[in-house]
Amino acid sequence: MQLLTYTNLASIAPDITLGAPASWLANDTAGLAAFVDYYGPEFDGTVAVESDAIGDAIDQGTADCFVVDSLDPVVARERLTLLLDDKVFVPSNTVIALLSEPVATPDLVATLDAIGASLTTQRLAQMLNEINANGTDPIVVANAFLDTL
């Protein structure tokens, strides 16, 4: 079975071990308990793995799947597949431009709308990886992004 969604993951949860930050595992309202209430079956096992240790945990086979922020550079570095949250358990990372009314000219609003439409979670993750993993200057990354608009 190819895993594409959280629903797919829930269907095999009883057979796999989930790695996640200890705080997520213990969070009753937005962590493991809430996920199980929302999507279904319990996992065969869980193991606490903090974000900075996911790469090592993958190499060691500590768990079968991991809870990771979609913008974490480990996603690109380890070539992780992000599953679709098909029931919207967790809102996506979103960039929103806020303007005060006096400066919100139609041209500025249109420009910010174009930027916002291009700043997808995947694109943000790529830019963060370029900065964090490759050491590229954030200004260089930002300018390269703006050049694509």
Where in this protein do the model-derived segments appear?
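Bilobed "Venus flytrap"/periplasmic-binding protein-like clamshell domains
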Residues: 1-55, 122, 135-140
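A bilobed periplasmic-binding-protein/Venus flytrap-type ligand-binding module shared by bacterial periplasmic
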Residues: 1, 93-106
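Solvent-exposed loop/turn segments at secondary-structure junctions
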Residues: 23-27, 71-75, 102-105
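Short amphipathic alpha-helical coupling segments at ligand-binding clamshell hinges
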Residues: 104-115
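Ligand-binding "clamshell"
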Residues: 40, 60-62, 74-88
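Paired acidic/hydrophobic, glycine-rich loop segments that form the ligand-binding mouth/hinge
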Residues: 63-69
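Acidic/histidine-rich, surface-exposed loop or edge segments in extracytoplasmic proteins
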Residues: 91-97, 121-125
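Extracellular/periplasmic juxtamembrane helices and adjacent flexible linkers that interface
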Residues: 113-149
